Amino acid sequence: MSARLATVLSRFASRAKDESYLIDEGIGAGYLLHVVVERVAMKVRGLALFPSRPARPSVGARARIRSKGDLVVGRGVTIGSDAYVDALSVDGVRLGDHTTVGRGTRIECTGSLRQRGRGLTVGRRVGLGTDSFYGCAGGVTIGDDTIIGNFVSFHSENHVADRLDVPIRDQGVTHAGIRVGAGCWIGAKATVLDGAQIGDGCIVAAGAVVTAGTYPPNGIYGGVPARLLKTRAASPEVAE
């Protein structure tokens, strides 16, 4: 029973994801049925929140979305349970096809009503891990096929602290923005600060703090602050 159900669901999942997706036949039927019920409920929530949209996200239980008009999603987008998305911003929040926002993750684009933030643009097939924070006031862009671990934080805003006679909170903020290229892997509990420009194919080690600067493609970066540890290279058979 479970193997047959896994085969059937694999076909549906492959069609929905536009790629081969094979479910482990050892997973019990009860577990698979629970997943199916949960996914159907997420689809229904998305339909209720965005009844007139051609593409609607699947929305988990207790997820909250503010400024829905500023949220644009592609096909097959999932917003996990307990996630919080406040899309109020100049460019809005744009989530590409088959992108996932993990459980408990917060996306906030505007820190003050005095000035709208820039927003968040995410490519296709991107995984934003669970329990993470994306502060997008200065703009955050993430390329296709990037995976971002759990408990990661992005902060695209800096406080001005040049004067000693004025409280820091009254000196204003600066925004340089953050860019993460395509095909990157950002490890769990990493912190990415305003002004960081991470090239395609990079790996950021767990717990690293990525400060403002340019990080060339295919580098492996780690530490506090993050520095180049090594450069990824094609294996001999691929290079040939």
What is the role of each PLM region?
Residues 64, 79-192, 224-225, 232-233:
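Flexible, glycine/small-residue-enriched loop-and-beta-strand segment within the central core
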Residues 70, 177-178, 196:
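Short coil-to-beta microelement around the adenine-binding A-loop and adjacent beta1/P-loop entry
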Residues 62, 84, 209, 220, ...:
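Conserved beta-strand positions that form and line the central face of beta-propeller blades
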Residues 49, 75, 170, 177, ...:
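Short secondary-structure boundary/capping segments
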Residues 197-222:
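C-terminal/domain-terminus segments
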Residues 1-56, 145, 151-152, 156-164, ...:
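Terminal amphipathic alpha-helical/low-complexity segments used for targeting or macromolecular assembly
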